[in-house]
């Protein structure tokens, strides 16, 4: 646990009592604060009381008298589409609002500077797609190289549940836009921006607000090094804003297709090979085609980001290459479930938006595509240029009929359910083809989350193998 510093003897309200909320309450209590907890769910409140915490109705009048801070969970809206009533009440009372990420940065290692021969460091990863894989890959590379490391944030443990800092340790955090938008302190040593595509726009008031939330990680006084994906205009702009000149090697530009030889420091992938260039010289080349856990151009971008971050930590190219080769990948992200009769079954349930689905569709030459769910704003019209590899689409969920109208001349069948889609795709697939779940939609019409959707796909596939 990371005890929260600077709030000793103060009352701190905690809104949202899921995993991060209860971890926050424990960390506040350990640091000497008095946490006051609230959740709309009676079950969540009862659980908190059962653990000995004080539950206070934060919806009542004058609930924030004497309260120094409100800490809220990331899933609770604080501005768009409308502030949660409790957050609105806190802001009206002049009470600052923070989250567990902000508390982490104000507390991690801050009282132990003299105890370390080598200071702990924090690497943060944000972006629209590839965050989890990049975060896990950095953690894996550091572990394989023998460096002490922990992983948390939007993946793995809550940040305040981490163990106290160790000498020379690297903490790797995956941060969503919800987390970066609200945190009052964001001071990573290395910050990674993978890419940007439309997502969560209702929570940020549009694309500009979404990008602004991501950019907060790179605010002045932020990271010593920045790793920036420049395959979209926003990343290109961000890299330019952070650089004092093209040869500035404090910013490492990464790409999944562009040659970036003219910059101070760059890492890019072309035709399956990763190349590192610094100050006009090629420093390394790695064959990513030999990495079974990193198929496709989108994973090559993830590899470039992780490689660059680990190079800033002093790791040698050959150390990183060996770890890339042993990385097994993450569940529900280009995950091979099995193969039968020359047909491969791949679970990419995490491809919940157009951009991530497009990258999944580019990874294989002949695809039986299972798509659909709860469609997002704009539908999937933007996927039409990427459907050349699709032999046939099998459409499921609430958006099935809308998707059928949006995929042009691509052969398709409305299946409604995962069971029928898997059965039909497996029945019609030919040797050399891939049955790919890449929904391009949220899961909430039929499943509680994308993990359950992916598990259902794998269950149906394994029954056929």
Swiss-Prot record:
Pathway: Cell wall biogenesis; peptidoglycan biosynthesis. It is an enzyme of class 6 (ligase). Gene3D superfamilies: Mur ligase, C-terminal domain (3.90.190.20), Mur-like, catalytic domain (3.40.1190.10), NAD(P)-binding Rossmann-like Domain (3.40.50.720). Pfam families: Mur_ligase_C (PF02875), Mur_ligase_M (PF08245), MurD-like_N (PF21799). It catalyses: UDP-N-acetyl-alpha-D-muramoyl-L-alanine + D-glutamate + ATP = UDP-N-acetyl-alpha-D-muramoyl-L-alanyl-D-glutamate + ADP + phosphate + H(+). InterPro entries: Mur-like_cat_sf, Mur_ligase_C, Mur_ligase_C_dom_sf, Mur_ligase_cen, MurD. Keywords: ATP-binding, Cell cycle, Cell division, Cell shape, Cell wall biogenesis/degradation, Cytoplasm, Ligase, Nucleotide-binding, Peptidoglycan synthesis. One of its GO terms (molecular function) is ATP binding. It comes from the Bacteria. The keyword Plastid does not apply. Cell wall formation. Catalyzes the addition of glutamate to the nucleotide precursor UDP-N-acetylmuramoyl-L-alanine (UMA). Belongs to the MurCDEF family. This is UDP-N-acetylmuramoylalanine--D-glutamate ligase. It comes from Cereibacter sphaeroides (strain ATCC 17023 / DSM 158 / JCM 6121 / CCUG 31486 / LMG 2827 / NBRC 12203 / NCIMB 8253 / ATH 2.4.1.). The lineage of its organism: Bacteria, Pseudomonadati, Pseudomonadota, Alphaproteobacteria, Rhodobacterales.
């Amino acid at each position: 646990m990371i005890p929260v510093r600077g709030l000793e003897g103060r009352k701190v309200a905690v809104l949202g009592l899921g995993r991060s909320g209860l971890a926050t309450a424990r960390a506040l209590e350990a640091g000497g604060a008095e946490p006051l907890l609230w959740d709309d769910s009676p079950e969540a409140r009862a659980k908190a009381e059962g653990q000995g915490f004080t539950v206070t109705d934060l919806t009542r009048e004058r609930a924030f008298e004497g309260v120094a801070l409100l800490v809220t969970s990331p899933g609770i809206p604080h501005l768009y589409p409308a502030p949660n009533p409790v957050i609105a009440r806190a802001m009206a009372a002049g009470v600052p609002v923070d989250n567990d990420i902000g508390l982490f940065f104000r507390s991690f290692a801050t009282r132990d500077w003299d105890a370390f021969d080598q200071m702990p460091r924090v690497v943060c990863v944000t972006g629209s797609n590839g965050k989890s894989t990049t975060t896990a890959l950095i953690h894996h590379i550091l572990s394989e190289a023998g460096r002490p490391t922990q992983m948390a944030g939007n993946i793995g443990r809550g940040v305040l549940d981490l163990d106290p800092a160790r000498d020379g340790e690297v903490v790797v955090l995956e941060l969503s836009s919800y987390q970066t938008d609200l945190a009052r302190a964001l001071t990573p040593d290395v910050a990674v921006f993978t890419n940007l595509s439309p997502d969560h726009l209702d929570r940020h008031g549009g694309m500009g607000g979404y990008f602004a939330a991501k950019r907060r990680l790179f605010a002045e006084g932020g990271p010593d090094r920045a790793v920036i994906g420049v395959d979209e205009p926003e990343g290109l702009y961000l890299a330019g804003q952070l650089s004092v000149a093209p040869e500035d090697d404090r910013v490492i530009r990464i790409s999944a297709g562009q040659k970036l030889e003219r910059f101070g420091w760059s890492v890019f992938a072309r035709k399956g090979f990763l190349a590192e260039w610094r100050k006009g010289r090629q420093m390394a080349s790695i064959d990513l085609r030999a990495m079974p856990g990193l198929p496709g151009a989108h994973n090559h971008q993830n590899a470039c980001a992780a490689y660059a971050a680990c190079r800033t930590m002093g790791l040698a190219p050959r150390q990183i290459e060996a770890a890339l080769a042993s990385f097994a990948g993450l569940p529900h992200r280009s995950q091979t479930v099995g193969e039968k009769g020359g047909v491969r079954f791949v679970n990419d349930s995490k491809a919940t938006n157009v951009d991530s689905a497009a990258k999944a569709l580019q990874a294989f030459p002949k695809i039986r595509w299972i798509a659909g769910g709860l469609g997002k704003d704009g539908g999937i019209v933007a996927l039409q240029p990427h459907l050349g590899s699709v032999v046939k689409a099998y459409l499921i969920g609430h958006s099935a009929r809308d998707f059928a109208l949006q995929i042009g001349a691509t052969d398709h069948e409305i299946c409604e359910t995962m069971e029928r889609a898997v059965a039909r795709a497996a029945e019609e697939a030919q040797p050399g083809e891939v049955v790919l779940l890449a929904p391009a939609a949220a899961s909430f019409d039929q499943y509680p989350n994308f993990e359950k959707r992916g598990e259902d796909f794998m269950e149906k596939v394994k029954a056929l193998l």
